[in-house]
């Protein structure tokens, strides 16, 4: 990863994975499994937000 556009692509990929995890979590009947997938989705969202911050910081430096 080298530039803001790459960072935004990574953020989009992570948000897509988070969306998929949430969709799968909604189909699970066992609470521990569902909760774990929801936690994973939150972790992915946080990582995506970090990539977006990096992209914004890179744009202001150019």
Model region roles, listed by residue range:
Residues 1-62:
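Long, non-catalytic architectural segments outside compact domain cores
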């Amino acid at each position: 990863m080298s530039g803001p556009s790459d960072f935004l692509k990574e953020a989009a990929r992570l948000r897509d994975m988070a969306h998929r995890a949430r969709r799968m979590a909604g189909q699970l009947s066992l609470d521990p499994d569902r909760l774990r997938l929801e936690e994973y989705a939150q972790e992915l969202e946080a990582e995506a937000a970090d990539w977006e911050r990096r992209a914004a910081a890179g744009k202001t430096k150019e």
